[in-house]
Amino acid sequence: MRKIIHIDMDCYFAAVEMRDFPEYRGKPLAVGGSRVQRGVISTCNYEARKFGVRSAMATGYALKLCPDLILVPGRMQVYKEVSQQIRAIFCRYTELIEPLSLDEAYLDVSDCKLFKGSATLIAEAIRRDILAETGLTASAGVAPIKFLAKVASDLNKPNGQCVIPPDEVAEFVKSLSLRKIPGVGKVTAEKLSSLGLNTCADVQAYPKQELIARFGKFGTVLVERAHGIDERGISVSRERKSVGVETTLAQDIYTLEQCQQVMPGLIQELSSRLGRSAKGRQIHKQVVKLKFNDFKQTTIEHRSDEVSVVMFYELLSQAMARQEGRGIRLLGVSVGLAESKDTLSPLMVRETKQLDFVF
């Protein structure tokens, strides 16, 4: 058993803006697209969420829900700098840190001797340090496995904490909605619901082999998570897994020819980014992404060990076959990166070591 903490900053980008510009406090605020150009909300504060505004929502729709919504373009460099401050705080407690984004990370504190090894007290201390040194609040989840730590961090937001001790895992997962399991999105949840599967308890009672036959490898993962099993360790590799570029179009486009006109600029920018951040890395796939005007999206990928411009156009044609008459509002291209030959695989830690838990 391990002691895993998942730290998730509360409405991070918006919180930084409210910290630096007090006039925004207490007012609905969103970081993202402007009123003039089309775009999407990156994040918003809790005042905006009361009106139904959410991350990844079209800016125009968000303004309909909340006409007084304050929109700011965002300051990514500032967000990165604050994230580095937070990362430095994590390092005081453990070297086993897996960043998921600028505002969240997993920490394995199994060997941390502070607070007599209590993961609960360690999480509280980390949150206190973050607040004292950055002026921002964080929520935390503490559990013996990764996915439950992430679930727990969302239960007492904002500025809260939830602990799931090892002896409570089995009971906790029984009533857990399958939507809380990573990989179970809306479409998968609907498929599971059609089988009468809505909670982990439902999966526990369902024939395992039938789930595997229906869902393949994901069926195996689903059964494990539903039983409170997650043997993934903390990955401390910092290598990028992909490089991509995408653009939200000023107006919807509808034809393959229109999309093809957008591609050269995307491919050129992708080439530049590969040169800057992935020089010498081998690729293992190419990907084209389309987002439609109903905000659903599709991706087409092709396994390859070299970048082919022709293949990007072929993938675009395949993606357009899924258009179904919808307008296209976003187009993106990316490549998946193989591990560097001179680096080790991500360090997977504490898979089997048994520890005395002090939660």
UniProtKB/Swiss-Prot annotation:
Catalytic site: 104
Cystines in this chain: none
Coiled coil: none
Gene Ontology molecular function: damaged DNA binding; DNA-directed DNA polymerase activity; magnesium ion binding
Biological process according to GO: DNA-templated DNA replication; error-prone translesion synthesis; SOS response
Requisite cofactors: Mg(2+)
InterPro entries on file: DNA/RNA_pol_sf, DNA_pol_Y-fam_lit_finger_sf, DNA_pol_Y-fam_little_finger, DNA_polymerase-Y, DNApol_IV, IMS_HHH_1, Rev_trsase/Diguanyl_cyclase, UmuC
EC category name: transferase
Boundaries of every UmuC domain copy: 4-185
Gene3D superfamilies (alphabetical): 3.30.70.270, 3.40.1170.60, 5' to 3' exonuclease, C-terminal subdomain, DNA polymerase, Y-family, little finger domain
Keyword Membrane: no
Cofactor binding note from Swiss-Prot or TrEMBL: Binds 2 magnesium ions per subunit.
Catalytic function, reaction form: DNA(n) + a 2'-deoxyribonucleoside 5'-triphosphate = DNA(n+1) + diphosphate
EC number(s) per entry: 2.7.7.7
Site (Substrate discrimination): 13
UniProtKB keywords: Cytoplasm, DNA damage, DNA repair, DNA replication, DNA-binding, DNA-directed DNA polymerase, Magnesium, Metal-binding, Mutator protein, Nucleotidyltransferase, Transferase
Cellular localisation: Cytoplasm
One family name in Pfam for this protein: IMS_HHH_1
Protein's job: Poorly processive, error-prone DNA polymerase involved in untargeted mutagenesis. Copies undamaged DNA at stalled replication forks, which arise in vivo from mismatched or misaligned primer ends. These misaligned primers can be extended by PolIV. Exhibits no 3'-5' exonuclease (proofreading) activity. May be involved in translesional synthesis, in conjunction with the beta clamp from PolIII.
Family: Belongs to the DNA polymerase type-Y family.
Subunit architecture: Monomer.
Protein name: DNA polymerase IV
Species of the source: Shewanella sp. (strain ANA-3)
